[in-house]
Amino acid sequence: MSSESTTFIVDVSPSMMKNNNVSKSMAYLEYTLLNKSKKSRKTDWISCYLANCPVSENSQEIPNVFQIQSFLAPVTTTATIGFIKRLKQYCDQHSHDSSNEGLQSMIQCLLVVSLDIKQQFQARKILKQIVVFTDNLDDLDITDEEIDLLTEELSTRIILIDCGKDTQEERKKSNWLKLVEAIPNSRIYNMNELLVEITSPATSVVKPVRVFSGELRLGADILSTQTSNPSGSMQDENCLCIKVEAFPATKAVSGLNRKTAVEVEDSQKKERYVGVKSIIEYEIHNEGNKKNVSEDDQSGSSYIPVTISKDSVTKAYRYGADYVVLPSVLVDQTVYESFPGLDLRGFLNREALPRYFLTSESSFITADTRLGCQSDLMAFSALVDVMLENRKIAVARYVSKKDSEVNMCALCPVLIEHSNINSEKKFVKSLTLCRLPFAEDERVTDFPKLLDRTTTSGVPLKKETDGHQIDELMEQFVDSMDTDELPEIPLGNYYQPIGEVTTDTTLPLPSLNKDQEENKKDPLRIPTVFVYRQQQVLLEWIHQLMINDSREFEIPELPDSLKNKISPYTHKKFDSTKLVEVLGIKKVDKLKLDSELKTELEREKIPDLETLLKRGEQHSRGSPNNSNN
């Protein structure tokens, strides 16, 4: 949904105050709104109301309903800080107030919210939702007939957050649950589930944006494909040509966006930050007057900077000790002209390709659904089936677009099961593309050998020397600490249709799919720890210094969900008996070692300084030279 309106209703009854449920609701609101402020969407609206409140302030003049935040879009950091401060100030003033005992204004608050939403958006197509924080599910004094009328009046869905300790059986008897079940797409969550959700790293969904559209060629001549004629490979009798397209399967996560700003004061002497524009200027050092400079001036800078125009700057190539500027005719020839395409160059066994050779973001290669035909789909499906049956991986030459970099990639076949619109199970056949390292990459990175050494007949060479045996055992010992080789996980846990993983709201809510919650514990899904750590520290800085007005900032500890992901906690079993035997390692008792060391020191006891001086005097008196004198 491109447009979204979220209205938060916080129950500020005494029970919510005493059990710190209002503080928990504020923590969720703060995290949610600060996340919304990063995107600053003009179509993402928020508002907030307080129910069961002794303060009355709303558009309908209904008692005990306080609109603490009017409709706001886009959500900004400044507005979020001001809103959380007002809510915190209210809680501090009424934390021990007993005047709101027995107030019941939740139904009135729902009606006020419904009228305000209708007045604000009228007939606009927008996702409307109300998030209610309460610990009293029996708060609604309403009959079944009134629930039907309220369902017709409310044109929004309700997301109920249960802040109490009610069991499932107690929930079933409450009027709140009846109202949630009566309104389509409404849900109910527990408050603790929301707190876990905002403190756990969430895997982002990769959007299916087409990144390549071209030909998958098998048996084609590479030289004949490097032309601008797209029908060249189609006319080759020895070439199997399939029209395919590529979509991103994984996406690299970048750090938080930062801008350079300067602190200034406005007319009201309030500090604010203004972005700084960067201007690049070029200058040269003029050495023409260097001979005329006196010796006293030579101690300082002997160069005179001369500013030059940007139009006078051109690229020069190093040739020996000089710089050469190529003419425009030769500059075009320095660019390697390449044309988009995917050429299969060979196949190898799946077990022969270690995972650490995959060095880029991966992409899905599928039959072209836009420019292809039925024959392309059948040929591509047959290729995937053959590779799956023989457990093969293809090595291909890949060019994503014209004049882009040429890469050698690995194509791994995958079979993904999902349900279509009619709930019919369907298998999607695809190839997963990932870049392989070049020689330049191996110069700066330590990659193990791709394949085991073999003879000309294909027989593997045996390593019989002790050094090779020790190296092999040590390699197995180190690999046993790796989390790379784990039990095979169903592909459905990783690759799912975009419709099953995308949500209709930007709110951080727990997933109703249990498989997705279990995937968060998968040791192969390692989140980008530094990004989440940056975000955690930044949000905590805003909370402490901007909202709580603290003078000092205390860096928060790393959440347990990230701590568990840093250290490998799942590894293979390895029998180290053979390695201990080859290396001759023996376990030595520490107490025995201390006693042997003490005996050796006593045996070779070093005399003190006075003893050495006395020995020197005796030696000097007893020498023949002194007696002759």
UniProtKB/Swiss-Prot annotation:
GO process annotations (BP): chromatin organization; donor selection; double-strand break repair via homologous recombination; double-strand break repair via nonhomologous end joining; establishment of protein-containing complex localization to telomere; protein localization to chromosome; recombinational repair; subtelomeric heterochromatin formation
GO cellular component terms attached to this protein's record: chromosome, telomeric region; Ku70:Ku80 complex
Record GO terms (molecular function): ATP binding; ATP hydrolysis activity; damaged DNA binding; DNA binding; helicase activity; telomerase RNA binding; telomeric DNA binding
CDD domains: KU80, vWA_ku
Location in or out of the cell: Nucleus; Chromosome, Telomere
Reactions accelerated catalytically: ATP + H2O = ADP + phosphate + H(+)
Presence of keyword Manganese: no
Amino acid composition bias (Basic and acidic residues), ranges on this chain: 608-620
Outcome after substituting T528A: In strain: DBVPG1853
Record keywords, A-Z: ATP-binding, Chromosome, DNA damage, DNA recombination, DNA repair, DNA-binding, Helicase, Hydrolase, Nucleotide-binding, Nucleus, Telomere
Family annotation (Pfam families): Ku, Ku_N
Effect on the protein of changing G499D: In strain: DBVPG1853
Annotated Gene3D superfamilies: 2.40.290.10, von Willebrand factor, type A domain
UniProt region (Disordered), positions on chain: 608-629
EC number: 3.6.4.12
Function as written in the Swiss-Prot or TrEMBL entry: Single-stranded DNA-dependent ATP-dependent helicase. Involved in non-homologous end joining (NHEJ) DNA double strand break repair. DNA-binding is sequence-independent but has a high affinity to nicks in double-stranded DNA and to the ends of duplex DNA. Binds to naturally occurring chromosomal ends, and therefore provides chromosomal end protection. Appears to have a role in recruitment of telomerase and CDC13 to the telomere and the subsequent telomere elongation. Required also for telomere recombination to repair telomeric ends in the absence of telomerase.
Miscellaneous comment: Present with 358 molecules/cell in log phase SD medium.
Record-given protein name: ATP-dependent DNA helicase II subunit 2
Organism phylogeny: Eukaryota, Fungi, Dikarya, Ascomycota, Saccharomycotina
